[in-house]
């Protein structure tokens, strides 16, 4: 890691702020509930790689702008791409998943604690991103949803790796099959979050 002072990269869908030894990464597509577009997924790899190389930092907070943590993959973007641009959906989804998986690997390489401050819905890939953090603190307005079954997809973003390690294999399978919306207190009871706080106390 380098200890030199370098300004964070300027990205379109993500904000990185550094305050002393604490970094904050904010998913910044509030109008889309911070859903992951291909651009955001690519920028996550840039952001996490930069953060992993910052020696002065001692902790990183990952959160979302507005009312959501992250609504998962941007299904609206994919639908529009198919209808208006004729993209090959299976190929685009596969490519996006590969980049997302690299972003999760880059996140796990960060050599200091990463805390997910879950300020609202964390669904699909957003749930996966929260699980990939070292631990999670949730707003009382947050909820967690696997969501993949609702679109006929298998979980990605590391969910099948992290979820069984957090809640146990049997409960993880139950959550993936039943696909509930877990309220913050329910998530705490399962061990998914360490603490639930008021919305005005989270950040």
Name what the model sees in each region.
Residues 28, 73, 119:
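Histidine-centered beta-alpha loop that forms part of the nucleotide-sugar donor binding/catalytic region
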């Amino acid at each position: 890691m380098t200890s030199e002072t370098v300004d964070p990269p300027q990205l379109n869908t993500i904000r990185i702020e550094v305050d002393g030894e604490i970094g904050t990464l904010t998913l910044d597509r509030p109008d889309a509930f911070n859903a992951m577009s291909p651009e955001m997924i690519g920028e996550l790899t840039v952001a996490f790689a930069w953060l992993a190389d910052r020696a002065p930092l001692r902790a990183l907070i990952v959160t979302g702008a507005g009312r959501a943590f992250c609504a998962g993959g941007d299904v609206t973007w994919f639908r529009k791409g198919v209808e208006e641009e004729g993209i090959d959906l299976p190929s685009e989804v596969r490519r996006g998943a590969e980049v997302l998986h690299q972003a999760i690997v880059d996140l796990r390489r960060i050599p200091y604690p990463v805390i997910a401050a879950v300020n609202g819905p964390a669904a699909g890939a957003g749930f996966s991103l929260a699980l990939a953090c070292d631990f999670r603190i949730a707003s009382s307005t947050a909820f967690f949803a696997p969501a993949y079954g609702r679109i006929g997809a298998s979980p990605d973003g590391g969910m099948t790796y992290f979820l069984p390690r957090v809640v146990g294999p049997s409960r993880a399978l139950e959550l993936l099959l039943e696909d509930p919306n877990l309220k913050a207190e329910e998530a705490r009871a399962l061990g998914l979050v360490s603490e639930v706080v008021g919305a005005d106390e989270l950040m």
